[in-house]
Amino acid sequence: MARAVHRSGLVALGIATALMASCAFAAKDVVVAVGSNFTTLDPYDANDTLSQAVAKSFYQGLFGLDKEMKLKNVLAESYTVSDDGITYTVKLREGIKFQDGTDFNAVAVKANLDRASDPANHLKRYNLYKNIAKTEAIDPTTVKITLKQPFSAFINILAHPATAMISPAALEKYGKEIGFHPVGTGPYELDTWNQTDFVKVKKFAGYWQPGLPKLDSITWRPVADNNTRAAMLQTGEAQFAFPIPYEQATLLEKNKNIELMASPSIMQRYISMNVTQKPFDNPKVREALNYAINRPALVKVAFAGYATPATGVVPPSIAYAQSYKPWPYDPVKARELLKEAGYPNGFSTTLWSSHNHSTAQKVLQFTQQQLAQVGIKAQVTAMDAGQRAAEVEGKGQKESGVRMFYTGWSASTGEADWALSPLFASQNWPPTLFNTAFYSNKQVDDFLAQALKTNDPAEKTRLYKAAQDIIWQESPWIPLVVEKLVSAHSKNLTGFWIMPDTGFSFEDADLQ
């Protein structure tokens, strides 16, 4: 009798164990392999798109952008703008809670915009909000934002990934450490952040949208090596990978369990030249370097065809972008210009990269070889996020070691101001923003400022074109390519995709 009871107990235990294993297997856990590490989980203090993309796990804004970079309501229901373009009145959704149980309301919006617009906080994204004069909570669901002057792109600023709503209680509790303790209204909350290895987020049970999220967890894992990232997808260690090494795209397409996606982007890759330093202060040198780079060949060598040669300084899908005749590859012309500029034997310089992943390494090697053919010896350095923050973003013109700098920019507002002002306006030299060419032109500054004071599309077009015409002629950059975004995912993962600004959309993601 005792033996029979023992056996049935074992059977019951076995069934229970099997059920537990089945439940564990059925958990909807997704691993996402990404190209670099995260700098912070505070969107207002992140300069990189990836950190802001991961922060969307926890955070939402009043507005957002869809796959076509069109404005959509998120925590806001609607907005109005005063006739003088100074006052924005935003109506908020009701009944939304932060992940710490506190209410999302107008007071919370005020707390976030007050923090963002206060220069004393030294937040990296301060320049997005410096035009805010004051924010008022009119009632729990109504916010009035008054600007210092008309700024026609302001609603796009509120849709930028940096403009996240953080719990005021968490801001009070954690202060400057909020970047390690995210608390928002988003679909996921922080589980673990191993700063050298991964960020894991888990489902927020109190999320305000019914039926969401559908995943139990997402683990964001930085994997710098392109081939390793692709291998993780093939072995099942990851369910989503971005960016995919272009040279492996064809191989992954043949895998019946993987879906490869190539989507449009607003990511422009370029090399800035520090125009305050010799020899790049000479326009003929800058012109020569533009002739020295074979962009169609670069598209094939570094991007395996998943890019197009740049035809301007603003990607074509951004509002008010202008296109120009692409720079032809002409090394003979490049040598002639260098000779005219006083460098018949070329010169030596440095070429830094903002990233150290495999594609960036290929771009550096290709560019180094191209420059060598016209007599320019470039010492290349591929930086990690920490090096970039310290050596490029953190130093002003006098102490900066930047000469040539390979990087990329995606104007996450979808509008030309954010594609031009941070990169070319005189007031936006590092460490303020990202004008790593240290370019300055009063006419350009004036045109950009005037464009923000008008809501007339025809006038904005005229002003932005005038600014871009000057920049294209003076060539503080070597515009290279506009990328196509190549990602891959397990076919049983749905609703997870790349935004044109290289961010992620995953609110509706599910494992089938």
UniProtKB/Swiss-Prot annotation:
One matching Pfam family: SBP_bac_5
Cellular location(s): Periplasm
Source superkingdom: Bacteria
CDD domains reported in the protein's UniProt record: PBP2_Ylib_like
GO cellular component: ATP-binding cassette (ABC) transporter complex; outer membrane-bounded periplasmic space
Gene3D superfamilies: Dipeptide-binding Protein, Domain 1, Dipeptide-binding Protein, Domain 3, Periplasmic binding protein-like II
GO molecular function annotation: peptide transmembrane transporter activity
Signal peptide boundaries: 1-26
Listed name of the protein: Glutathione-binding protein GsiB
Taxonomic placement: Bacteria, Pseudomonadati, Pseudomonadota, Gammaproteobacteria, Enterobacterales
